[in-house]
Each structure stands twice: as structure tokens, then as C-alpha cells.
């Protein structure tokens, strides 16, 4: 089973009292599988990993692995600010049954490129899971440069990168490193279609929490080089790309999920979607139903 196509960075549903809503979690997982996603990320930034206890982390990963039952790839977010803690969290995810570790660059500490190289090598050597690098400078404060990635691609336990930067030059530099054992995944919904048309292997998406089938359709078209159809779907989904960044992730996408009956909000310091954006959430949640139906029909006809 390849690591490619549409991979959803799952939001974590909470109940009205703020505890994990495992019934909603299982329903979200089934909706994702029914929509055709090819992988899931558990307890990443979209999953509010920083707000989860160790026991909650274990519960989410274990439940996802059991629910998925080998049907798609399970990636667990394991990146923390220190190398030793990241290794320990990666080992924890391995014990829980995850197939891959999604390892973000260490937040806040801003290591040098040499430090990033040593960090990822240590995690790959000692974590017990295949590592997918994750670069998202807007959140972490450091940028994993292509030349550093180039020094990591030969490591047998480093199998890909999720790149949230969208510049064509960055994407091209990473796509040039692709191989049978190293994949390039977009981490930006808004530019993902163009990245895949340029050779990227897939998308780790936020908005696919609410529209799994539509984003599967987008990825299928872009990955097979169907420019006109891919661009048409990218246009249909452009409002969702934008909306999911209108406030800090995962605030907007959790507003969409709540309207679909999944979850009841966020944990501090994140607050619910502001009143000014609620009408847009209402409209987009309603429109998502039609887009999911259209994408399903197209995939059945393809």
C-alpha cells in the first residue's frame, strides 16, 4: 500500500464537556474511508496534538488503527520540540500500531540546518517507524531547506516529506528527489493541485475532513495529469481551501465538522469560529453535501 493520494490530517472530536468523543471519532474515520481517502494522520496539528494528554493520544491512535483495520495507512504525529521526546513519542506510536510517523520540524527552538539534519537522523535511527518529514515554517519558526532534505533522502527509514510551503521552486526541488522509496506530499490545500500536476505524490489535507470524496477526486485527477478536470475541481474547492485558513487551523474545519454532526468545539487556547465567519461556515457546510455527491458520481463513472 503506497503512501500517496489523499491523506486527511484528522481533527480530533471533543464532546460538549471537552472530553474525547470516541463515537464521533469512529464516525469520522468511517466517513473518511467511505469517501475514499488513502491515509489518515492522527494527532497532528489539525488534531490539536498539543492539547492531548498521553492517555488521549494513545486512545486516538489505538482506536484509529483498530477502526481502519489495514484499509489505509495510519500516520501518527510524533514531532516535539526535543529530539529525545520525539524519539520516545515515535516509539509510542509504533507500539500503538501506526505505520508511519509524521515528524514536524521542532517547534519554537529554531535549530540550524545542521541541527535539523541531526535531529531527523536520530529519530529515523531510533524511533522504530518510517519517518515522513514535515515542514511548516509558519507554525514552527524554522524552514527545512531542500538541501537538508537532499541529505536525508538516502536514509532507509526516511520515506517522504509533507511540505506546506507552496512556492513552485520549492515544490520542483523536492519533486526532483522523488523515488520509489521517497514521496513528496503537499501540505497546502490551496496549491496541492498544481503541486501534484508538477509531480508531487499526494496531499495531506485539512479540508478533506469535511469533503473526503471531493479531495480524493481532486487528487486522482491531478496525479494522473488531467489538467483541465483537476483545475475545475480545484476551482470548485477553492472556497474550502481559503476558508480553512481564515482562522487558525483547525478552528474553521471543526466548524464544518460540527455542522455535519462531528464534535463540539476545540480546547483552549483555541476558541470556536468567530461570529463574522459563521455564515460562511453555514453555506460551505451545506454546499459540501452536493460536492461530495458529485465527486462520488464522477468516481463511479471513471
Swiss-Prot record:
The active site is at 134 (proton donor/acceptor), 162 (schiff-base intermediate with substrate). GO terms for cellular component: cytosol. Keywords: Amino-acid biosynthesis, Cytoplasm, Diaminopimelate biosynthesis, Lyase, Lysine biosynthesis, Schiff base. Pyruvate binds at residues 46, 204. The record marks 45, 108 as: Part of a proton relay during catalysis. One of its GO terms (biological process) is diaminopimelate biosynthetic process. CDD domains: DHDPS. SUPFAM superfamilies: Aldolase. It comes from the Bacteria. It holds the Pfam family DHDPS. InterPro entries: Aldolase_TIM, DapA, DapA-like, Schiff_base-form_aldolases_AS, Schiff_base-form_aldolases_CS. It is found in: Cytoplasm. Pathway: Amino-acid biosynthesis; L-lysine biosynthesis via DAP pathway; (S)-tetrahydrodipicolinate from L-aspartate: step 3/4. Catalyzes the condensation of (S)-aspartate-beta-semialdehyde [(S)-ASA] and pyruvate to 4-hydroxy-tetrahydrodipicolinate (HTPA). Homotetramer; dimer of dimers. HAMAP family: DapA. This is 4-hydroxy-tetrahydrodipicolinate synthase. It comes from Xanthomonas campestris pv. campestris (strain ATCC 33913 / DSM 3586 / NCPPB 528 / LMG 568 / P 25).
Amino acid at each position: 500500500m503506497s503512501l500517496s493520494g489523499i491523506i486527511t490530517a484528522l481533527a480530533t472530536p471533543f464532546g460538549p464537556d471537552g472530553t474525547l468523543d470516541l463515537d464521533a471519532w469512529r464516525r469520522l474515520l468511517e466517513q473518511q474511508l467511505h469517501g475514499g481517502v488513502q491515509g489518515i494522520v492522527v494527532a497532528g496539528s489539525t488534531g490539536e496534538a498539543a492539547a492531548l494528554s498521553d492517555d488521549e493520544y494513545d486512545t486516538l491512535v489505538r482506536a484509529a488503527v483498530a477502526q481502519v483495520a489495514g484499509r489505509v495507512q495510519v500516520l501518527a504525529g510524533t514531532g516535539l520540540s526535543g529530539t529525545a521526546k520525539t524519539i520516545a513519542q515515535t516509539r509510542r506510536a509504533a507500539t500503538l500500531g501506526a505505520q508511519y510517523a509524521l515528524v514536524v520540524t521542532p517547534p519554537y527552538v529554531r535549530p540550524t540546518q545542521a541541527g535539523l539534519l541531526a535531529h531527523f537522523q536520530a529519530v529515523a535511527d531510533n524511533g522504530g517507524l518510517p519517518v515522513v518529514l514535515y515542514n511548516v515554517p509558519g507554525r514552527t519558526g524554522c524552514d527545512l531547506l531542500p538541501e537538508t532534505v537532499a541529505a536525508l533522502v538516502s536514509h532507509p527509514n526516511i520515506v517522504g516529506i509533507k511540505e506546506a510551503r507552496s512556492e513552485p521552486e520549492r515544490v520542483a526541488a523536492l519533486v526532483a528527489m522523488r523515488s520509489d522509496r521517497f514521496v513528496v506530499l503537499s501540505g497546502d490545500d490551496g496549491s496541492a493541485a498544481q503541486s501534484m500536476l508538477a509531480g508531487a505524490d499526494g496531499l495531506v489535507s485539512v479540508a478533506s475532513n469535511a469533503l473526503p470524496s471531493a479531495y480524493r477526486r481532486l487528487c486522482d485527477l491531478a496525479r494522473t495529469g488531467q489538467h483541465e478536470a483537476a483545475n475545475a475541481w480545484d476551482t470548485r474547492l477553492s472556497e474550502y481551501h481559503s476558508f480553512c485558513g481564515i482562522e487558525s487551523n483547525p478552528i474553521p474545519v471543526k466548524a464544518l465538522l460540527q455542522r455535519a454532526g462531528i464534535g463540539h468545539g476545540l480546547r483552549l487556547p483555541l476558541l470556536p469560529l468567530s461570529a463574522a465567519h459563521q455564515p460562511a461556515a453555514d453555506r460551505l457546510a451545506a454546499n459540501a453535501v452536493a460536492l461530495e455527491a458529485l465527486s462520488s458520481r464522477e468516481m463511479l463513472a471513471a
